[in-house]
């Protein structure tokens, strides 16, 4: 796709979910098959540089990207969920949002120690999820 600019395919809503915060909606990019194909091609090239062992999709829209990336690079993927969504023993981590804090969790049995993990989320606003 010549002159591809992803920003042209993301809608922005100012002051949502609260004043001073801009909500970035990726839905328009996902609805256009040409944009989606270009996005996945670009993300696959970028992720391949890291030579990942596994991908981790952040709940929930990160799942949209982690699975096709894992398939393209012949890796597995795990789901990192919002706190309280998984039964059994879990590992949890808190992170700061631009409007508060949140927790993520994953099953403690998921073997990611000593592996190269690429985290997938739907956007990067503050970096709080990845901190």
Mark where each language-model region is.
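PRPP-associated nucleotide enzymes
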Residues: 1-131
């Amino acid at each position: 796709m010549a002159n591809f600019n992803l920003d042209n395919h993301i809608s922005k809503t100012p002051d949502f979910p609260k004043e001073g915060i801009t909500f970035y909606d990726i839905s328009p990019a996902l609805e256009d098959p040409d944009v989606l194909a270009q996005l996945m091609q670009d993300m696959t090239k970028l992720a391949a540089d890291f030579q990942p062992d596994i991908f981790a999709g952040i709940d929930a829209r990160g799942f949209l990207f982690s699975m096709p990336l894992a398939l393209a690079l012949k890796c597995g993927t795990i789901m990192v969920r919002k706190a309280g969504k998984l039964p059994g023993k879990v590992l949890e981590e808190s992170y700061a949002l631009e409007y508060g804090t949140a927790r993520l969790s994953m099953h403690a049995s998921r073997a990611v120690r000593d592996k190269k993990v690429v985290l997938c989320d739907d956007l990067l606003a503050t970096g709080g999820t990845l901190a």
